[in-house]
A protein has these predicted regions:
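Glycine/tryptophan-enriched, flexible segments
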Residues: 19-20, 160-283
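Trp/Phe/Arg-rich N-terminal binding region typifying the photolyase-homology
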Residues: 1-187
Length: 283
């Protein structure tokens, strides 16, 4: 199994690994998928080295800018897919949706008290970098952020490019060595990773842990979340399953025409993957 390249791994704090901890935590924040994900691969590397099980934590805040029913529903549909994938492979998964602003305060520290180490996603946009830095200062164990944003690692570039043309020239020269570094297609299937038979008893003070039934049909309880309820769901379904269906449609019906018709809006030959790429449901 290929190791995660060092250039993709960033230490967020100066804490060490708590080798006597009960589990390794993958704190999912941007790459909300359990396939082809360097951050998940890194968490599993720690699991194998420490012989500790994995705890997958996928939280969703309610107080981020533009929080709406539409965005929440899309992310929660992805949680449903992730919960099913973790269950198929015998791993513990916690999909947690904040029910009131600040309702998750202290949760990560509580989990970290029993963890060996934390791994999260290294994503350069929105409120996530600031949040990761703040959490890193509060955790008593090592927090690593791992870049799984694209084929080229973010830290392979040592400058800000003034134009897309300048970046493309750099990319054409520098991308090739990184193309052989691939995340694992089915990382949770590894039999060498111990399994956590059930979720740790850590969530009583933080209501929001979602049952399979709540993830399957969030329609009713979403009404109780203090988000913009006027921005309703669309016909799009979130999650890896729907993302792969969209990708398959593009490859089988649109790709052959894309080269000549991509600039024709009425041709509808674009991939249509933007919503799923945005939330990391597919890479």
């Amino acid at each position: 199994m290929q190791a995660v390249p060092d250039i993709r791994i960033r230490r967020v704090n100066d804490q060490g690994i708590h080798r006597a901890g009960d589990f390794v935590v993958y704190w999912m924040t941007a790459n909300r998928r359990l396939h082809f994900n360097f951050a998940l691969d890194r968490a599993l590397e720690h699991c194998r080295a420490l012989q500790r099980p994995l705890l997958i934590l996928e939280p969703l805040r309610c107080d981020y800018r533009w929080a709406s029913r539409r965005l929440h529903a899309f992310v929660i549909q992805g949680m449903r897919d992730n919960a099913a994938e973790a269950r198929r492979n015998g791993h513990a998964y916690a999909g947690w949706v904040e029910r009131s602003p600040g309702g998750g305060s202290g949760l990560l520290q509580q989990i970290a008290a029993r963890a060996c180490t934390f791994v999260t996603d290294d994503y350069p946009c929105f409120f996530l970098p600031q949040m990761i830095r703040a959490v890193g200062r509060q955790l008593p164990v090592l927090l690593e952020a791992v870049d799984s944003n694209g084929l080229l690692p973010m830290r392979a570039a040592d400058q800000i490019f003034p134009t897309a043309y300048a970046f493309r020239r750099f990319l054409q020269k520098q991308l090739t060595p990184h193309l052989t570094d691939c995340p694992t297609p089915q990382p949770l299937a590894d039999p060498a990773v111990p399994r956590l038979s059930q979720l740790p008893d850590l969530f009583e003070r933080w209501p929001g842990l979602c049952s399979d039934g709540e993830l399957a049909d969030p329609t009713g309880w979403l009404e109780t979340i203090p988000i913009d309820q006027s921005v309703r769901e669309t016909s799009y379904t979130g999650g890896t399953v729907a993302a792969r269906q969209c990708l398959s449609l593009f490859l089988t019906r649109k790709l052959a025409r894309y080269g000549e018709e991509r600039n024709e809006p009425d041709a509808d030959v674009a991939s249509g993957l933007s919503p799923w790429l945005h939330f990391g449901h597919i890479s």
